[in-house]
Amino acid sequence: MKFLKNCIFLCSIISACCTAQAQQAGLAKQNNRWAIQPNGSIAWKTDNRLPHTDHIEMSGEKVSLWVKYGIDTSGLANLTRTVVFPTFRMLPDDTRSHIAYTFHDNELPRIYINNQLLHLSSEDGTGDINLKVKSINQHGIMHLLGQAGRQGTISIDRSLFPSVDKPLAIEKFTITNNGSEQIIVSMEKSSRMVTTDSANSKSAPHTVIMKTVNDGRHVLQPGQSVALSVCYLATDHPGMLSPVNPLAEETARKQRVAEILAPLQLQTPDSILNTEFAFAKIRATESIFKTKAGYMHGPGGLSYYAAIWANDQAEYVSPYFAFSGDSIGVLSAMNCYRLFASYMNPQYKPIPSSIVAEGDTYWNGAGDRGDQAMIAYGASRFALAYGKIDSARKLWPLITWCLEYSRRHISQEDVVTSDADELEGRFPAGKANLSTNCLYYDALTSAALLGKQLQIPAKITDGYRKEAAELKAAIEKYFGATIDGYQTYRYYETNNTLRAWICMPLAMGIFDRTEGTIQALFSPKLWTADGLATEAGKETFWDRSTLYALRGVLQAGATDKAIDYLHYYSTRRLLGEHVPYPVEAYPEGNQRHLSAESGLYCRIFTEGLFGIRPTGFNSFDCTPRLPSNWNNMALNKINAFGKVFDLRISKQTGGKIAVKVIQGGKQHTYVIKSGDTVKVVL
C-alpha cells in the first residue's frame, strides 16, 4: 500500500509538471472539478461551484443507460435517466428504430426514514429529510454519495449501472445507519409498465417495466445497511419475468469492467494519461450489443445502436480491438467486416455507409463518403495486428474489393474521388478530399504487407506498393498547399481555410509537410479549448480529428509538443466539466460520449506513443516516442499478433532508449537512438 501511495504521489507531481508545461505552451489553464482516486476511479466532491450538470452513458449487451445529473446550490441531486433497448425495435426499420424511455426523479417510489419522506431533488415538506450529495464517483458504475438526517447520521449510496447481458438497468439505494439508535427504512412497492403498439412493433409488442426490488419496511440497527432498488427493463414476455438480483447484476458489471481493464495496461509517469486510457478502454469496449446479427459495436449517444458505420466501427474502433485482449471486442470487429462484406457486388456499387436495425437494413444517405477506403484501412490494420491467418483470409476479399472500388474512382489528377467525407456534408469536402486519400494510401500499404503474409502473388502486392507510392506523390501535388501562411494541406481542391483533417497525412505516415502542419494544428486558428476546430474560425469541433492529430504528431516525432497537448486534452475530458470520456462533437449532439472515439484515444498510445505499426502476423515496426522528461513508459499485457507481451521503453545515456519486449519467459532488449525504429518479431 505504501508503494502504491508513493507511485500515485510521484505521478501526481509529474502530472503537475505536465500541466505547467502545457500552460507555457499557450494552453488554457484548467480548473479541475474531478480528482483521480487510488482505485482508478474519479470523484467529484461537491464544492461551492454549484449548480453543475453533466451527463454520461453506460452500456451492456442489451441496454444503454444515459444519465443526466445535476447538483443544485443546496446539494440536492436531480437525475434524468434514459434507458435504451437496442434490440427492441419498432417499424419501419431505420437507424433510430430502437425503443427508449426516460424516467424522472418524480416517478420514483417514495422512500421513508423513520416515517419521514426522503427528498431526493427538492427541499419541500415540513419535517421531512433531504438527501444532500457530498460526492459523485465514476468507474463504470455511477455512485452519488450523500447524507441525510439532522446530524448526517444516515449515509446513502445511490448507484446506477447497466446489466452486462440483460435488457435491464438498475438504480440502487444503499442506506446505512451510522447513528447510535435504530432506524426504520421503507420504500413503496411499485410496478409500472407500458407496451408498444402491436402494429408498429417489430417481432412482437415490447413492454418496458419500472419496478422495485426489496421494497417494504426494514429495521436497521446501528452500523447496518439495506439496499433498495429500482429496475428498468424491457421484455416481450411480461408474464414470464425472472426475478431481478441487483447485487448479482452489480457484481457482474464490476467483473466486466475489470475484465476490460486487465489487458493492455498503460504505465507512464502521467497519472492523467494512465487513467483516461483506462476509462477510454471501458467506453470503447462496453458499447457492444448482442444482436440477432451477432455482436455489433455501436456509437450510442441515444441515437446509434445495433448498427455499424464504416468510419466509427470499421475505421476507428475495430483496429483497436486487435490489441485490446477483449474477446467480445474481437468478435464485434470480425462481425463488422463480415456485415460490410455482404454488400460487395460485381458492379462495384458502393457499400453503404451504415448497416442498421440489427443488420436488417442500411443507410447511405450521404452517398459514398469514402467508405471503401475506411473499410479497407481498418480491416487490413485489424487483420495484421490480430495475427490470425484464418481471420485474415476471411477479410482479404473485402479488403481487395474495397481497394479495387477506390482504384476505379481515381481521377485524372490521380486522387480518389467521393461524394462526401465522414462529416456527410456538414462542411465542404469537394470532389476529392484529403481524408479519403490518406486512408486509401494506408490501406494499400497494409494490404501489401498482409498479402505477403497470405502468400498472395508478388505481382498483386507489388502493385499495391506501386499504387501507394503514386498516390503519396499525388497527395502532395493535389493537396499540398500554403494556407494562412502554413505549409500544409488544403482539404479539397478549392479549399482556402485551415481544416482539422490536415492531420491525416501524419497519422498515415506521410511526413512531407510535417513542420507546417504541426504549426497549423496547434495555432490559435485551429486549436481551441476543446481541441481542434473543424474549420478555422468556427466553433464546431469533433473529437475524432483531435484524436487523429495527437496520434499523428507523435508519429511525426514532435513528442514533447504532442504530450503537452495530449495531457491538456486528457485533463479536460477526464477531470473537467464534462467527464470522463472523449466525446463526439459540439454543438451537434452536445458532446455525446460516442464510444468509437474512445477507441481512437487508445490508439494514440498504441500507434502514436509506442509507435506500433503492424508489418506481419507476428511482427511490427516499433518507433517509440519517449518524452524528454520521462525516464520510462510501458504498455503491458498487449494482446496482439497472436501473442501476449509487454513493451517497456526506458531512457539510456547518450540520447538512446531501450526497447524491451517481454513475452512469457522470454525477453529481448533493443537499444536504439531516439526516433529510430525497431523491427520486432515475436
Question: Where are the regions a protein language model picked out?
Answer:
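Conserved helix-loop functional segments at active or binding sites
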Residues: 286-290, 342, 346, 381-384, ...
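Substrate-binding groove/exosite segments of carbohydrate-active enzymes
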Residues: 258-393, 420-423, 494-507, 521-522, ...
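Active-site core of glycosidic bond-cleaving carbohydrate-active enzymes
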Residues: 309-324, 329-338, 393, 397-400, ...
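Short amphipathic alpha-helical coiled-coil/interface segments
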Residues: 277, 281-284, 461-479, 569
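Terminal accessory carbohydrate-recognition/targeting modules of carbohydrate-active enzymes
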Residues: 2, 22-275, 558, 562, ...
